[in-house]
Design a protein with these regions (language model features):
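Conserved phosphate-donor/acceptor-positioning beta-strand/loop module used by diverse small-molecule
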Residues: 89, 100-126
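PAPS/PAP-binding and catalytic site of the sulfotransferase fold
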Residues: 14-28, 100-104, 182-207
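Hydrophobic/aromatic beta-strand patches that form the interior of the parallel beta-sheet core
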Residues: 5, 29, 108-110, 181-183
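Short catalytic/ligand-binding loop motif for oxyanion handling, primarily in non-cytosolic enzymes
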Residues: 16-19, 37-40, 94-96, 117-122, ...
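PAPS-dependent sulfotransferase catalytic domain
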Residues: 63-79, 121-202, 253-255, 261-263
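PAPS-dependent sulfotransferases, especially Golgi type II membrane carbohydrate sulfotransferases
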Residues: 1-5, 154-157, 165, 169-174, ...
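Glycine-rich phosphate-binding loop used to anchor ATP phosphates in small-molecule kinases
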Residues: 69-96
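PAPS-dependent sulfotransferase catalytic core
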Residues: 1-72, 80, 128, 218, ...
Length: 271
């Protein structure tokens, strides 16, 4: 029986890198951005709204549906890989912990997090380097999205950053965070072997000796699907780069992010 684990991380926080590090372990099948949760989520919507299910015994139908979800999840990965461990990557697993836990008890979820100022700076840098495309967020005649500060405000209230941060906030309010293994991107850069050993301990899997100087990218996806922010390419070598978030965002934007997400800075001890 395969063990399925779940990667539910913040955007621009190293989740693709983590997948490809794990992919060095021959025991692991790792996904790019996965749609498996979407299959289950759609099934839940149909199960909830279909009169055919409503008209039958509630407990019997509930039991059947949860078994359907478990069977679908396990059968999907039984078909695509013969490896004993799977790490499925989708940002939604964390906030939908209750749903997942209802048919896959006590799921193990890992979440990459990062200083929000670096996340927003990464978004802004992608915006600036893709000027040959229309970002869809700038309207000069209406003065929308025309400055870094305005773009920070837009990203904080929309996908992917705003939604991810709001979900993270709610996960802490519900206590879901206590069931998740968090890895700070900055810690992974500083001491990758230590962080990976902690992850293996959480997953209850035998540790593997990784090569952090030669990480082959084995997950591939068409980044054009995600627009100018769909950058899922990784560097072959783990190395800590200088923090340029303040120079990219400017002092006002840099300070606004820290104030607006003070709870995050407190929880994860960012300063």
């Amino acid at each position: 029986m395969k063990k399925i684990f779940f990667n539910s991380s913040l955007p621009r926080s190293g989740s693709t890198l983590l997948q490809n590090i794990l992919g060095q372990n021959p025991e692991f099948y790792v996904t790019p951005t996965s749609g498996v949760l979407e299959l289950l989520y759609a099934a839940r919507s149909n199960y909830t709204s279909s009169p055919e299910f409503k008209a039958q015994d509630f407990e019997t139908m509930k039991s059947g549906f949860l078994s359907f979800c478990l069977g679908g999840l396990e059968s999907f990965f039984d078909e695509v890989t013969d490896k004993p461990y799977v790490m499925d990557k989708s940002r939604g697993w964390g906030i939908h912990y209750g749903f997942l836990n209802s048919f896959y008890p006590n799921p193990k979820i890992v979440s990459m997090v990062r200083d929000p100022r670096s996340i927003f700076a990464s978004m802004e840098k992608n915006f600036r380097k893709n000027q040959f495309m229309d970002s869809g967020m700038v309207n000069h005649s209406e003065l929308v999205g025309t400055t870094t500060e305005k773009r920070i405000d837009i990203w904080s209230q929309s996908q992917p950053v705003g939604m991810a941060m709001e979900r993270m906030y709610q996960m802490f309010r519900e206590g879901i965070n206590e069931k998740i293994h968090f890895i700070k991107y900055e810690d992974l850069m500083k001491n990758p072997a230590h962080e990976m050993n902690k992850l293996y301990k959480y997953l209850e899997v035998e540790p593997f000796k990784h090569d952090f100087n030669d990480i082959e990218q084995i997950t591939h996806e068409d980044d054009s699907v995600y627009g100018i922010y769909g950058d899922h390419k990784i560097r072959k070598k783990i190395q800590q780069l200088p923090d340029d978030s303040k120079s990219v965002l400017g002092t006002h934007g840099y300070n606004w992010i820290k104030q607006n997400y003070s709870w995050f800075f407190d929880e994860f001890k960012y300063y």
